[in-house]
Amino acid sequence: VCALIKGNKADNGRVIGVRADIDALPLEDKKKCSYASKIKGKMHGCGHDGHTSILLGIAKLINNNRDIFGGTVKLMFEPAEETTGGAKVMIEEGILKNPHVDVVYGLHMEETIDTGTIMVKKGTVNAASNPFKIVVKGEGAHGAYPAAAVDPIVVSSQIIMALQTIVSREINPSNPAVVTVGSIHGGTASNIIPDEVEIGGIIRTMTKEDREHSVKRVKEIAEGIARSLRAECQVEIEESYPCLINNDELVERLRQNAEKVIGKENVLEQKNPKMGVESFAYFASEVPSVFYFLGCRNVEKGIIHPAHSSLFDIDEESLPIGIAIGCEFIVDYLTSC
């Protein structure tokens, strides 16, 4: 979903994209409030309803004040952020063209900081990710006669342990990185050695070099260990979300705009990149972009639960703050020399 708002002043050729993700999660909403999900097994457990509300609020105010700016605001509502990353498809289908988008602005609700504050960072904000699947193929046999088998469970266990050396022994310790194995499936009974085991995991890195190295080494380690233990191995590694990297100049502009709304003391510095991924990174890979975190925690109201939890909630008082900062940034960008 996309919409354009054009200013009534002389067109300066500037176009700013403002993005909100709109999808929900496959969770049962256990909140006790008027806006809890009415659809069984589906809820807004990551604040995307807040993002959408903020963008709609920005749209209303910007549209009602077109006389104060020239240029164009492109409203971009992104589906499938939690799954395949809708931003990638939107870009492929031309969301950043006709008219060409010069910069993109976005935010995310942040339940670890209080309403009335924001958190922003120059440079890398979120990690890149590469999900992987490893299928180890051996030869099954009776559990009493392991010499008659090529045991894929033993092979898989060695692969899993060896993968941890990528981060601990091959990545610069100054660069955060993670290789996580989250699933392993194989076997049907305690006395049967299976033919096959499937391993599922994900790589998370902060630099292009670490990403390329980790992807290469997962494949080399898995195939090498399997071969040395007489097994076969198939490795599939997906090219998923890139690192989200903020534009330094836009971060400075955002800080100044946010300080006008909430005060300098409430504009917090994000000290370290987040290991989670964010599909806004696709936009930031194409054009200069800025992405920040909007505080939505309120201890007095009991709004303290983490994202992707069935009790996740946002303090609604954070919404007008997000709208005000967004409008301040947009108008400043479109009216500055």
Describe the role of every protein-language-model region.
Residues V1-H44, S53-L56, K60-F69:
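Acidic/His- and Gly-rich active-site-bordering loop/insert found
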Residues A3, V18, H48, L75, ...:
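Divalent metal-coordination and catalytic microenvironments
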Residues I16, V103-Y105, V290-Y292:
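Hydrophobic/aromatic beta-strand patches that form the interior of the parallel beta-sheet core
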